[in-house]
Design a protein with these regions (language model features):
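N-terminal subdomain of nucleotide-sugar transferases
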Residues: 1-58, 98-102
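A conserved catalytic-core segment of Leloir-type glycosyltransferases
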Residues: 39-101
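An aromatic- and histidine-rich active-site surface loop
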Residues: 87-91, 106-137
Length: 147
């Protein structure tokens, strides 16, 4: 089975966190079980792309992400506004990359960046994994409740 993970970060990354750790562990576990695994992640430098092998897991880092790491690209106001345009454009690139792989059986995305919303009609099952479900609980974690 060819499994594709989509995430904003994959180790090593300056923005790595829980999602990055989860993806790396699960991707390697699935590879070790005999599956073909591709990870599509954002490049830390939104100007650069790469395609590398991480011990059997293919890692594609896309340029043009909708967020930037100030210590890599600076922190100008213009760059912050550019991120609004890139929100859609970057998700379109993810979609195109998945389709270009040609033989993906299933795609897994976190809810955090809404990438799954743009993949609903690609003809491949898409699993949305909840990493931050408390943000979706408007009753217990709403701003109104804090006031």
């Amino acid at each position: 089975m060819h499994i594709c993970f989509v995430c904003r970060e994959y180790p090593p990354s300056l923005r790595g966190g829980g999602i990055a750790s989860y993806i790396k562990e699960v991707a390697h576990g699935l590879h070790d079980a005999g599956h073909r695994v591709t990870v599509i992640a954002a490049s830390d430098d939104t100007r650069l792309s790469s395609d590398e092998d991480d011990e059997g897991v293919r890692v594609i880092r896309l340029s043009g992400g909708d967020f930037l790491i100030p210590q890599v690209e600076g922190n100008s106001l213009l760059k912050k506004f550019r991120m609004f345009y890139r929100f859609y454009a970057y998700r379109k690139r993810i979609r195109e990359m998945i389709l270009s792989l040609g033989d993906v059986d299933v795609v897994e995305v976190p809810e955090y960046g809404a990438e799954g919303y743009f993949l609903h009609d690609i003809g491949i099952p898409v699993i949305t994994r909840l990493h931050t479900p408390m943000l979706l609980d408007h009753y217990h974690f709403s701003l109104q409740k804090l006031l």
